[in-house]
């Protein structure tokens, strides 16, 4: 393949080498600071509609394997790398990154200065961008880019359309799919949970009819304020069933209890974000992927901040003062990234036990 252009909304143009699928795309450009884990990132549906830049200088060197998918159908718009490894060496490798992107109809660009690109995003914030093959009129592409309105139904696009089971012999968990990563299912499977995955717009009564022991609110893409039906569902189940929210689930849980959210300048996307547990001072290194956060302004009395990001002090976790419910902004399931916070799945199951014991004693 030949040359390919990356055109930013602010007018900046990068020229590089095309790889992956042969098509033009427009999306929100973001960056990920992880040194590995590109397969998990590309298949993470939280990147729905986004052009994903990897800051690490070499990507693709261990190929793509069958084990590390976070979704069967990746929904990111494009991939930007400094260097795409033309040869991949790993005993699990099934195909190269280039072959994988072609098979999933995702275009890529390599050979550009991703450090310079990342500095632009950090300074100006995330913005629209276009990946286009050389030869197209730049003026026409820029006009199209300016005129493009990015969709807001990201969660609707990636959520399952019908409920499905992930059988187990332990606790019954209803997992509300806002764009879930398969690693969340794997964490529950390790703990022998019987999981039912349901669409994002499932009602509170429909969830209660499944007789769950606990409810998990998954990660997902976009703006949490775009799914008001999820807020209504959360209000209808909290206090009746223990709740655990991750990433998008954290934001929705907070909104449902009267908090507000805001769009971050360039978000948290990487696997090395240090988070402090306020009560103990414990530091966990966490995997994160989000462009919105819960605001400290006017945080309702019902929510107690439990975790914060060390660098920017953004809220990384809350728990409800009166109900058996808590949430975190980061990914305790990792995939990719450190497993420092995987204990939160155990704490959720312990919360379920305590709730059921208290309920039985009344």
Curated annotation (Swiss-Prot):
Residues 172-358 form the Glutamine amidotransferase type-1 domain. InterPro entries: Anth_synth/Amidotransfase, CarbamoylP_synth_ssu, CarbamoylP_synth_ssu_N, CarbP_synth_ssu_N_sf, Class_I_gatase-like, CPSase_GATase1, GATASE. The active site is at 247 (nucleophile), 331, 333. PROSITE patterns: GATASE_TYPE_1. GO terms for molecular function: ATP binding; carbamoyl-phosphate synthase (glutamine-hydrolyzing) activity; glutaminase activity. Its EC number is 6.3.5.5. GO terms for biological process: 'de novo' pyrimidine nucleobase biosynthetic process; 'de novo' UMP biosynthetic process; glutamine metabolic process; L-arginine biosynthetic process. CDD domains: GATase1_CPSase. Keywords: Amino-acid biosynthesis, Arginine biosynthesis, ATP-binding, Glutamine amidotransferase, Ligase, Nucleotide-binding, Pyrimidine biosynthesis. L-glutamine binds at residues 46, 220, 222, 248, 251, 289, 291-292. Residues 1-169 are annotated as: CPSase. It catalyses: hydrogencarbonate + L-glutamine + 2 ATP + H2O = carbamoyl phosphate + L-glutamate + 2 ADP + phosphate + 2 H(+). Pathway: Amino-acid biosynthesis; L-arginine biosynthesis; carbamoyl phosphate from bicarbonate: step 1/1; Pyrimidine metabolism; UMP biosynthesis via de novo pathway; (S)-dihydroorotate from bicarbonate: step 1/3. HAMAP family: CPSase_S_chain (MF_01209). PANTHER family: CARBAMOYL-PHOSPHATE SYNTHASE SMALL CHAIN (PTHR43418:SF7), MULTIFUNCTIONAL TRYPTOPHAN BIOSYNTHESIS PROTEIN-RELATED (PTHR43418). Small subunit of the glutamine-dependent carbamoyl phosphate synthetase (CPSase). CPSase catalyzes the formation of carbamoyl phosphate from the ammonia moiety of glutamine, carbonate, and phosphate donated by ATP, constituting the first step of 2 biosynthetic pathways, one leading to arginine and/or urea and the other to pyrimidine nucleotides. The small subunit (glutamine amidotransferase) binds and cleaves glutamine to supply the large subunit with the substrate ammonia. Belongs to the CarA family. Composed of two chains; the small (or glutamine) chain promotes the hydrolysis of glutamine to ammonia, which is used by the large (or ammonia) chain to synthesize carbamoyl phosphate. Tetramer of heterodimers (alpha,beta)4. NCBIfam families: CPSaseIIsmall, PRK12838.1. This is Carbamoyl phosphate synthase small chain.
